[in-house]
C-alpha cells in the first residue's frame, strides 16, 4: 500500500503506543505526519527523528486535550503547517482510569470524557475546513466498549461514545467525500494497558485469545494506516476489531 504518499496526516497521542505505531506506519507509506503529544515532548521528538531517519517527513505539534480549548489550539497549529489540506486524521489520544463504580470521582469521569470524547469531536469540527474530498478520519475505540472489562466502566463508556460518533460522522461527512472509521483494539501491550503488565492479566488475556499472544502497537497501527489508504476506500462508518480473535 502506498496511497497516503504525498499526503498530510495528523496522529494525536503519537508519542508512544498505538499512536506512535500509526504515525510510523503512515510515514512509511509516504505521508507527511504531524506527531501530536501532550506531555511526552521527548518521546514525540524521538518519533519524528525515527521517521526522518527512514527518509520520511514529520513535525511535532502539542496540545492538552483536558483543556476546553485544546482541540482549537491543535487545529491552529496543524493549519499553520499543512495549509488548506489535511488528508488523514487519526484521533488516537486517550487516557484510562481503573476504578470501581464506587471509586470513580466526578473529576475522573469528566477528565475521561474531556480527553477521550470531547477532544476528538471538536478536533474533527475544527479541522473540517481542511478535510476535503478523499480525506479519511480514523478514531480509536476499544473492545471494552462492548464488553464488561474489569474496573473500566467510565473509560469503556467513552469508547462506546467513540463507536457511536463514527456512525454519525460517517453519515454527516459522506457528502463531502470524507470517510470515517474506527479501530477497536483488544488487549495491547502499551503504557495505557496496565492490565497486560500483570501475570494474572496476561494469563487471562491469553486464555481468551485465539492467537495466544498479546497484541502489539504495530498490530493496530498497520490497520489504522490501511483504513486511511485508498485500498479501504469502500469502508466507511465501521469499527474494526483488532484483537487477534478475543472471545470468539
Describe each PLM feature range.
Residues 124, 158, 166:
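Active-site helix of classical SDR
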Residues 100-101, 105-113, 205:
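Substrate-binding pocket helix/loop in short-chain dehydrogenase/reductase
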Amino acid at each position: 500500500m502506498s496511497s497516503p504518499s504525498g499526503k498530510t496526516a495528523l496522529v494525536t497521542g503519537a508519542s508512544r503506543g498505538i499512536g506512535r505505531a500509526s504515525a510510523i506506519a503512515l510515514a512509511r507509506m509516504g505521508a507527511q505526519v504531524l506527531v501530536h503529544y501532550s506531555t511526552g515532548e521527548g518521546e514525540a521528538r524521538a518519533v519524528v527523528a525515527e521517521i526522518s531517519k527512514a527518509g520520511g517527513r514529520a513535525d511535532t505539534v502539542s496540545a492538552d486535550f483536558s483543556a476546553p480549548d485544546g482541540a482549537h489550539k491543535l487545529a491552529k497549529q496543524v493549519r499553520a503547517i499543512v495549509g488548506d489540506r489535511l488528508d488523514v486524521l487519526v484521533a488516537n489520544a486517550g487516557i484510562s482510569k481503573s476504578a470501581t463504580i464506587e471509586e470513580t470521582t466526578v473529576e475522573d469521569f469528566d477528565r475521561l470524557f474531556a480527553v477521550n470524547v470531547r477532544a476528538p469531536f471538536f478536533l474533527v469540527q475544527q479541522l473540517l475546513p481542511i478535510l476535503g474530498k478523499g480525506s479519511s478520519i480514523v478514531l480509536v475505540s476499544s473492545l471494552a466498549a462492548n464488553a464488561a472489562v474489569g474496573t473500566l466502566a467510565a473509560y469503556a463508556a467513552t469508547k462506546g461514545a467513540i463507536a457511536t460518533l463514527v456512525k454519525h460522522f460517517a453519515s454527516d461527512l459522506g457528502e463531502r467525500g470524507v470517510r470515517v472509521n474506527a479501530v477497536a483494539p483488544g488487549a495491547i501491550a502499551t503504557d495505557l494497558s496496565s492490565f497486560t503488565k500483570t501475570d494474572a492479566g496476561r494469563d487471562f488475556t491469553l486464555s481468551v485469545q485465539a492467537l495466544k499472544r498479546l497484541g502489539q502497537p504495530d498490530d493496530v497501527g498497520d490497520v489504522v494506516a490501511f483504513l486511511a489508504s485508498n485500498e479501504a476506500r469502500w469502508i466507511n462508518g465501521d469499527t474494526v476489531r483488532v484483537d487477534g480473535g478475543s472471545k470468539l
